[in-house]
């Protein structure tokens, strides 16, 4: 067993991509009358893409990135704006 902490790297290009995708998906969910936050949380927890509407191709768009990449951006944003 290796006790070394593994380093997880996340580059600026991916950060921008995550922001753009979340923005598009959020907008599509809002337009269809869904609670975008609840739907995104459902998707992030379960991995079930049916939490995301097909409107404006949002379901296909969200699947362009991995859920861990989305979570990384959310955690980073929260830390940057609330702790540091």
UniProtKB/Swiss-Prot annotation:
Annotated Pfam families: IreB (PF06135)
Extent of the signal sequence: none
InterPro entries linked: IreB
Disulfide pattern: none
Residues spanning the membrane: none
Family: Belongs to the UPF0297 family.
Name of the molecule in the record: UPF0297 protein Csac_1773
């Amino acid at each position: 067993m290796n006790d070394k902490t593994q380093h997880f790297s996340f580059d600026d290009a991916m950060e921008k991509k995550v922001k753009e995708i979340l923005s598009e998906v959020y907008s599509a969910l809002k337009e269809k009358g869904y609670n975008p936050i609840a739907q995104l949380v459902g998707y992030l927890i379960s991995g079930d893409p049916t939490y995301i509407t097909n409107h404006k191709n949002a379901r296909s768009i969200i699947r362009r990135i991995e859920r861990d990449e989305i979570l990384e951006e959310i955690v980073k944003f929260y830390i940057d704006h609330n702790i540091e």
